[in-house]
Amino acid sequence: MDSAARNRLDRAAPRAAGHQQDRAAPHALRDYALLADGERGAVVGPRGEIVWMCAPSWDSDAVFASLIGGEGAYTVTPEFRSVWGGYYEEGSLIWRGRWVTDEGVIECREALAFPGDAHRLVLLRSVTADGGPARLSVSLDPRAEFGRKALRALGRDDTGSWAGRLGDLYLRWSGDVGDARVLRAGRGSRLALHLVVPPGARHDLVLELSDQPFDEAQVDAAAAWRATETAWAQAVPPLGGVTAGRDARHAYAVLRGLTSSSGGMVAAATTSLPERAEAGRNYDYRYAWIRDSATPGRRWRPSARTR
């Protein structure tokens, strides 16, 4: 981690006494999923916890930093015991988290609206239930500047959507979240929601973060999902003439998700995760390194004939 980021993390405001934020234990990296739209990325754990995301850009300060021991997470998780799983929709970075519970099967489809806007991120989460009602706990606890600043100036409008400030960012949370409770979180606030989704129904959650005030209406979840599906279908070629085409398309989707509108491709979405334990090689990967960008280009050059 660079010194500036480390200092901000070390100066993070202490949590108020009595505030119990469920901090999930870390998992092996292979158990996490990546959501990315070209301008930023989010890392999702098997419990439905978003444990890493920088906003509004790859190299901005993290608003969810629990992956590296900081504060901030956005969790949509079953209330009762479950067995987790999940998969990417082919040729995209649309993730379907899946939990088998005693009552049925819960799915949470999630993505960053694609392609991304450099100033404004839209994080889509859609919960469905099969075989029985989905009972979930939802917690939105973003923390600006690697955990230093909690959500403030929080209010609810006539549509039931929430809006507030997060450091220098503007936040809006919509999708039938009017019943969410405001809880104290240090010197700011967090939102908690008990969610019950009947079998066959769907519940959308839409989180927006921007470095500019919201001048437009809140996001229509159904329209945003359609646009994201279409954009991924157009962005990832069939690659029918290569070996292991499905894997190749997924790799292509990952590289596209890491590539911004400027043409630069970040090495990875995260920072400071060691390559090996106590090896002293903890790099900030959220930048376009020439070596890391050149290697995929060399590997993908033969596939250009299949497009």
Language-model features and meaning:
Residues 1-307:
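Acidic, mature catalytic/reactive cores of soluble proteins
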